[in-house]
């Protein structure tokens, strides 16, 4: 604790110089959460138009694509997408109705699944997407979502002034929210469940002790955690607690904190494994920010902390902050090993006081990977089994195939396997240097770039759903080849249904690996040739190509074959 307070004091001495001396300590971290809250309530971040026809739905989609393109340019790697709004959703739920932000009419479909669309678009850009679930508030008392929920569970909703809230003291609240989160995780390839307002309303009249109140909120978190992790243990559990956990020995929270005021025992959730990640809402300055950020780090228990920054205060309509308030906070967070999250998307992309330019051109100039959840799994995937390069006029195409196993030989069970691509003018490529990252978290198996005048060296790694990264498969520039034609045109191969015999033109010493690919050019089976016979018994029925990778990492297509059932009409 004393050491971090010394850092805090020294940091303030450095703020006068815009934080540059501290920034030089680790200017380009390879692992860092860089997040943004993308708010859908009222369309305040997105969407700004309604989907009431096929054409208007496409306009809505194009707006989100444009937003994500700009976030990608700023090297944002995590999008917190508001999914459950106020007892309403942006996806077809069996529990709650559509929110009106998409179609303009509460309860009416916009004609497409906005959550699925957002997931697809985020993943195309190498970004994680977390379903942001607003938990306790359910909107105005007479709003559509609140009315529908009150009809089904009249005793579950409490009224405070004009607003409705799920009762945090009712056992059914945790069960209901857990089922909603289970529905999302079962149906969608989300990377996280992000709980918002998982606390008592600050105006709640407590009739129980604060310890009992904290126990009630923790039981809700436990139920949601169990539901999510039972379905997919690689899905991150996170929440956005009040930005100051509690009063510190030297700094007062001014009565606004998570632990005492609203019964959020968020640091215990990290310790007990109920949360993988926290996004504390630290919309403060000075001694209401810096020491409390250190406190979150000191009580992170090896988990991920990415404080939320109140960049909306840069807008003169919202506050009177200066850009230096935000930049000094960013420098501080990086130096103590925390990530950052911007509240919210509009204020980042509107570039108030140049904040977007600062992040894009300077602070987040290079990509970063989301830290792995080693507390859930620390198995290391096998490195890509093949990596080859092909040069055509003016372009260079890098191709690779993944193993579907960990280094210990067990199968990778996460549904998606990702790759990171590195490039450098030096060999071997230093994959610990974020400046060499050119493509992150991609599900593609090839990359085409313009051919430069100087030699470029490449390396590719594999990551699983937990974020564990393999050793690098390095490719020396001497491996560059033209389109391989050694074995002539690909031919039709015959099969017994359980095995294939390699063509007579192929010698075992020519092949390092045999790869079976489907018609989408995805590797479905990788093996080493033995006795010229390739066992395909475990491959599903279908049409495939058989490919050979030689010891120079050059891949050739040997031919095509049909696995038995695909031949039936």
For the regions a protein language model found, what residue spans apply to each?
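Catalytic domains of carbohydrate-active enzymes, especially glycoside hydrolases
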Residues: 62-88, 187-190
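Aromatic-lined carbohydrate-binding/catalytic grooves of carbohydrate-active enzymes
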Residues: 74-110
